[in-house]
């Protein structure tokens, strides 16, 4: 290996390397910019034509595309020159049995390499070989199909394989300048998403039709666009933190500018649960007897409110206990009786409320059944014995305080060993709510707000009235020192003794040099 082999290696890309190896502008290659337009395509839409017409120069267009262009621009789309619609010539292409364009005389199929011409007077299209042999060389200038006379100048070249400049799409005037004709019907159709679905099967179309019928996206969007209603903040529901709108408007230009801090409003349920201090009591009337339940409303307020509200709306009336396991639990609260149904009072599952001082210890513990974390609805179960392993899995919200003999009778009913369903129906006929702490909490909150409304005007009146002695000090003149009494300053000056007459001046002792050490 030679020395200094990496001496010319750079830690950066040089200009020459970037130009030749890693990027940079490449030299233009004219042949790569050539885009060939087939002879059977419209020079404006660049799509196969249906009603072909041509200009005196032999540029082919589709009648449905060129007419709107001429109405708007009045120019030739390929070169930008003025063009009159009356100068367009209708072309009559012939097709063979396979549906391909061909010469009606020689029956040669037209390709992109065929020399194609048309007669101006009739619009018939032929291969150049047929016109050259039968018209030009024979000096018989009559149409080969209709026998109509024409001149040498009436022969229009539509395609010459040796001169393809007019078929170069890259040189078209409307392509270079990005000029288009906007069809109102097409623009309206583009607003429908199905416009962009070209190939769909029957199943997809049926699914889309069903989606369009049930789609409520516009309603949801309109609901989200509405400004949320501001909660009324008072002394009871005012949080110790602000809404954060001031800082948000300061850091984001998308927010509406805010300059005043507003206290955030505490959720109404959180406020109500602070006033719930009592237990709730409910009785279940079953076909086996009555069960008296005590609800821990002060510990699990959300779960207990759900149970009490469902009992008050008679949600559990007529439901059965669909699952019973001896020495374990009995479960109910499902209107369908299958163990998979039921809804909460609010129509959606709510969160678990685990408390360390509540455990599945003992007989008659009332707890919520669920299908996983935070999936509580309406189903509940009552334990027949201690089940401590269910702690922190199911929310305990009450216990049985009366009717243990009824609970024993329920346990003695035999169940199907495969499905755990009682062979004899155990049904809840009705429910009775004796104590509802939430009504008392609502009444207490309403009373607190009434007293606040009464106290607020009185405090405003007191604050508006000036208090005794709260007036400003007396002014004696304008400007600096306007509160100073001139008489007080004069009296103080007269009573002040003269220091020059009473205090004697102390005499300085002359210094006598070093002296001796007697004073040391």
Swiss-Prot record:
User: What residue stretches are annotated with the U-box domain?
Assistant: 35-108
Composition bias of kind Low complexity appears in 463-474
The catalysed reaction is:
S-ubiquitinyl-[E2 ubiquitin-conjugating enzyme]-L-cysteine + [acceptor protein]-L-lysine = [E2 ubiquitin-conjugating enzyme]-L-cysteine + N(6)-ubiquitinyl-[acceptor protein]-L-lysine
An annotated GO cellular component of this protein is: nucleoplasm
What is this protein's function per UniProt?
Answer: Has a ubiquitin-protein ligase activity acting as an E3 ubiquitin protein ligase or as an ubiquitin-ubiquitin ligase promoting elongation of ubiquitin chains on substrates. By mediating 'Lys-48'-linked polyubiquitination of proteins could target them for proteasomal degradation. May also function as a chaperone, playing a role in transport to the cell membrane of BSG/Basigin for instance. Probable inactive PPIase with no peptidyl-prolyl cis-trans isomerase activity. As a component of the minor spliceosome, involved in the splicing of U12-type introns in pre-mRNAs.
Q: How does it assemble?
A: Component of the minor spliceosome, which splices U12-type introns. Within this complex, interacts with PRPF8/PRP8, EFTUD2/SNU114 and PLRG1. Interacts with isoform 2 of BSG. Interacts (via the PPIase cyclophilin-type domain) with CRNKL1; they may form a trimeric complex with HSP90.
Tell me which CDD domains the record gives.
Answer: cyclophilin_RING, RING-Ubox_PPIL2
| Tissue expression summary | Highest expression in thymus, pancreas and testis. Also detected in heart, placenta, lung, liver, skeletal muscle, kidney, spleen, prostate, ovary, small intestine and colon. Poorly detected in brain and leukocytes. Strong protein expression in lymph node (cortical, paracortical and medullar regions), thyroid (follicular epithelial cells), testis (developing spermatozoa), stomach (cells lining the gastric pit), pancreas, kidney (proximal and distal-tubule cells and collecting duct cells but not in glomeruli), endometrium and colon (goblet cells).
Family (UniProt): Belongs to the cyclophilin-type PPIase family. PPIL2 subfamily.
Q: Which residues carry this modification: Phosphoserine?
A: 470
* Region entry Disordered, spans: 456-520
Q: Where in the cell is it found?
A: Nucleus
Name the keywords, alphabetized: Acetylation, Coiled coil, Isopeptide bond, mRNA processing, mRNA splicing, Nucleus, Phosphoprotein, Spliceosome, Transferase, Ubl conjugation, Ubl conjugation pathway
The answer, when asked if Metal-binding is one of the entry's keywords, is no
- Judged by the first EC level, this protein's enzyme class is transferase
Q: Which residues form the PPIase cyclophilin-type domain?
A: 278-433
Q: EC number(s) on record?
A: 2.3.2.27
Q: Which residues form a coiled coil?
A: 197-217
Q: Name the GO terms of the biological process aspect.
A: mRNA processing; protein folding; protein localization to plasma membrane; protein polyubiquitination; RNA splicing
Annotated metabolic or biological route of this protein: Protein modification; protein ubiquitination
Query: Single GO molecular-function term?
Result: ubiquitin protein ligase activity
Instruction: Supply the source organism for this entry.
Output: Homo sapiens
Q: Which PROSITE patterns match?
A: CSA_PPIASE_1 (PS00170), CSA_PPIASE_2 (PS50072), U_BOX (PS51698)
Name this polypeptide is given: RING-type E3 ubiquitin-protein ligase PPIL2
- Which residues form the Glycyl lysine isopeptide (Lys-Gly) (interchain with G-Cter in SUMO2) crosslink? 216
Record has Nucleotidyltransferase as a keyword: no
